[in-house]
Amino acid sequence: MLRGQTLRWRAALQTPRSLILRPLFAPGGYNVGPRSVLETSRRFRSLPPSLRTFSSSTARRKEKPPPGDEKEDSNKKENKDNDDGTEDKEVERDPRRKQADSSGKHGSSVDPGAPTSGFARRREKAADRDQRSVTEDAKREAEAKGNSSDTPSAIPVSDSSSESKPSGSHNGGDDGGKKGKKNDKALQKPSVPDVYPQVMAIPIAKRPLFPGFYKAITIRDPNVATAIQEMMKRGQPYVGAFLFKDENADGDVIESTDDVYDTGVFAQVTAAYPLRGEQSGVTAVLYPHRRIKISSLIPPGDSTKSGNSEDKTTEKRGDVVASFEENAAELVTKDHYEPTSFLRKYPVSLVNVENLTEEPFDKKSAIIRAVTSEIVNVCKEIATLNPLFRDQISAFYTDQFPGNLSDEPAKLADFAAAVSGGELHELQEVLESMNIEERLPKGLVVLKKELMNAQLQTKISKDVEAKIQKRQREYWLMEQMKGIKRELGIESDGKDKLVEKFKEKAEKLAMPEAVKKVFDEELNKLAHLEPAASEFNVTRNYLDWLTQIPWGQKSVENFGISHATDVLNEDHYGLKDVKDRILEFIAVGKLRGTVEGKILCLVGPPGVGKTSIGKSIARALNRQYYRFSVGGLTDVAEIKGHRRTYVGALPGRIIQALKKCQTENPLILIDEVDKIGRGHQGDPSSALLELLDPEQNSSFLDHYMDVPVDLSKVLFVCTANVTDTIPRPLLDRMELIELSGYVADEKMAIAQKYLAPAARELTGLKNVDVTLTEEAIEELIKSYCRESGVRNLKKQIEKVYRKAAFKIVSDLGEDVLAEDKALTAEGKAAQEESEKETGPIESTSEQEKATTENPRVALNVPDSVHLSIGKDSLTDYVGPPIFTTDRLYDTFPPGVTMGLAWTSMGGAALYVESILENALTPESQPGLDITGNLQNVMKESTQIAYSFVKSVMAKQFPENRFFEKAKLHMHCPEGAVPKDGPSAGITMATSLLSLALNHPLDPTIAMTGELTVTGKVLRIGGLREKTVAARRAGAKTIIFPADNMSDWLELPENIKSGIEGHAVSWYSEVFDILFADLDKQAANRVWQKQLSKEPKKSNDKDDH
């Protein structure tokens, strides 16, 4: 530092430190943050100019002369003992000393912690010595400059500060002789150096710093924190702040210039406080002065290498601040100006920087004036929305713009970016922009975004406040209403009425004693609960369910046999077994006077009426009907309910059925019981065991109700397609009633009596002369709908009538019934009302007319319209036939037989084909290949049949060595359909024998039966369905096991009509029926010619 500036700094140091530090940056008084920094800046600027300079160190200053000033040191030594004696004399000799002394006293009066009078006198004495040595210092500096032009000045300062002369208690230099001249600048704020070539770089995260705006940062690196503290002690608290490119980066040292933006700010550390809870970190308050740019980086590793060569002279901890004369002397001795050389002993990042200068601009430019005005307007808008922003604008305007805003557009752009929450790169662009015309629009963009955020925040705040106010108003009104009711004596929160309602319901029900006890307990609990309590609603829902179960409520049953018969015949054709069982059930109830619940299970293929028969039974018995399906059900809670501890718990489907039916004796249909699933929530089929057990369901326990419910009076009807997938314990609890498929005669009767009339009414042809002839229905059944049920037949009949309706409307034309005549009186009134509201519609599209919701009348078809749909014209309505022949083969070749199968879809004809793969030769090897998607049981039946027929051939046809040399292939058509079951044994054996004996079979013979290896024919199931399938396939003879004779006798005559049945116990009986005309001698020699050929002598044995 120049010697000429020493007096000014010494005078500044005479200002009491506590007067400045305590109100501005006291650690206990303020938290460092945006608002505290603004407040600090405002209070700092409100101080007199003489009090704005302060030291950054709180330690006492060590009294010692500047290095190299031997005269001062000797004077100090000579006058060490005479300080007190000479003070008064010095004051008398120079009246200006009194002025300095009075200023010192003034400082002491302001700050109680000011130095004692002895210390003040010593400080005045040092100032006097400085005055006397000013001339000598100036001469010494001039001589040094003259001797070596390469030696730089100590510390360069700004032009204004170098031009201003130092002032203090005495005038130094040439002003010493000007007595009586008043100096208005007794104390001045030290100026910021205009040139500072090397600074310590501190990386900043999230957002850059802008000149003129304080920023508090946290330093956790101990080396950086220590370096900052030493910089402040040396009176050189200047750093460079540069923004991280990665917004997630963190650190206090710059490792590479690629990590930060090269444009930053030259900032002064105005204060540093230790971090709370951390020993090494500090919180530093930075005040940026100007923009700078990195020219080169000295990484931490490089800066510490030269740390040993720097001057080790440092100030002790007890000093107030290091003497500026000492620093100046240290720097003068060096060859180059390096104010940060003492930082090289720390592993911090140092950068060489250069100042950035703003490009000249015209303040009167229209663009600058327009953008400046817009920024001011946006600031005003934000200030109206955000009070904190309004305070920031007020402080900024007071500090930065003593005059007109348009005179400082650069500062205005910086302010816009500093207070906005824009993106990192947007703010950095504002900082890097040195062209004012470019910087202003960029600042305006980020400020506009801040305005949008403020508007959105205000909108959200208003919406939330409105909702809260609405709730508060409702709550206040409710409380006021309660108070009014309390004053009128009609106070009631609804709980008393609710309790009374439950009591009234319970009085109408015949609750069992155990249920009544639980009801009273829960009702008492409800009476003592607050309506706002969460358990209040749980108890209320439970009592609601408890009082909605029809305890003791029964529907009056109809035990009339004739009435039940009429109802069942009206709804269904056939189904004699089901109807007889229901009539038996009614007869028993009529004799006993009461009916106990039963569990029936209707088993049959789809479309035979299992579900609809349940509704007919309920109507015949005059019982309420409830149906639910358990197909795919995996949760036990659907049957037995959830426990009340769960949120949203409900009872099971059985309790829900009782609530809906409001009787204890409804008919509950459990559909698709064979398709019930199993999951991690449990096994619902096991839950049905208690429900469907007549010995246990008298005290069925639902998890939600937790009280026994009597289900013994409920008639349960289950439906299933097959019984194989029903668990055996569950199947044992149900009474099975099998519904076989319908034969052609039954389908014809059902179509004529039920399906056709319903389809005519559904398609609007009830009063139209449209006839579907009997031949057409027979053709539909024969060529389109061969399944066991009538569901597909119903679809085809509806399709025929729909086509007929379209044909009639097309032939009559659109003018038969105009749109204005198609509306009913109600529809016309609605249309007129709509026209009054919306006005007359000049043009209405056809689509709008077609989609009107106004009621319409039916079209009256003239009596002249007649339409008859016969067999010949059926293809015009339903397309070509699906099944063209009655059977797969009109004539069977050897090896083909027709068996019978029973599936979930009903009975079906199962053909078995066997062929010889290779020609028979003495060298050929036997074998059997099987195809047709056969499952394990059928594969075993194939092996049994193969072994059995080889035994038959060996015994009855020993000369026929067919199976010893034949490579065979057996196949069952429709390979996409999985096939399984043991009833195809005799069919496979017959197919192999027919091929071995080369004897074709009669195509009208069908067979079914399980075969053992000894030839025994065992019992099979589904004889009715298989008989129906045989009739559809055109069979006239059926071979079945003798054990199924009872099933055959129970078949209706219409099913057995035209079919001859043969019951067999051994396969020999089957052989006699099928091969009655067989010539055994010829059959013995049928393959003799092929097997007697001598083997070829050539090596080509494969040539046939």
Swiss-Prot record:
Pfam families: AAA, Lon_C, Lon_lid, LON_substr_bdg. One of its GO terms (biological process) is mitochondrial protein catabolic process. Residues 64-104, 125-144, 172-187, 308-317, 825-839 have a biased composition (Basic and acidic residues). Its EC number is 3.4.21.53. SUPFAM superfamilies: P-loop containing nucleoside triphosphate hydrolases, PUA domain-like, Ribosomal protein S5 domain 2-like. Keywords: ATP-binding, DNA-binding, Hydrolase, Mitochondrion, Nucleotide-binding, Protease, Serine protease, Transit peptide. GO terms for molecular function: ATP binding; ATP hydrolysis activity; ATP-dependent peptidase activity; sequence-specific DNA binding; serine-type endopeptidase activity; single-stranded DNA binding. Residues 891-1077 form the Lon proteolytic domain. ATP binds at G604, P605, P606, G607, V608, G609, K610, T611. It comes from the Eukaryota. The active site is at S983, K1026. Homohexamer or homoheptamer. Organized in a ring with a central cavity. HAMAP family: lonm_euk. ATP-dependent serine protease that mediates the selective degradation of misfolded, unassembled or oxidatively damaged polypeptides as well as certain short-lived regulatory proteins in the mitochondrial matrix. May also have a chaperone function in the assembly of inner membrane protein complexes. Participates in the regulation of mitochondrial gene expression and in the maintenance of the integrity of the mitochondrial genome. Binds to mitochondrial DNA in a site-specific manner. PANTHER family: LON PROTEASE (PTHR43718), LON PROTEASE HOMOLOG, MITOCHONDRIAL (PTHR43718:SF2). This is Lon protease homolog, mitochondrial. It comes from Emericella nidulans (strain FGSC A4 / ATCC 38163 / CBS 112.46 / NRRL 194 / M139).
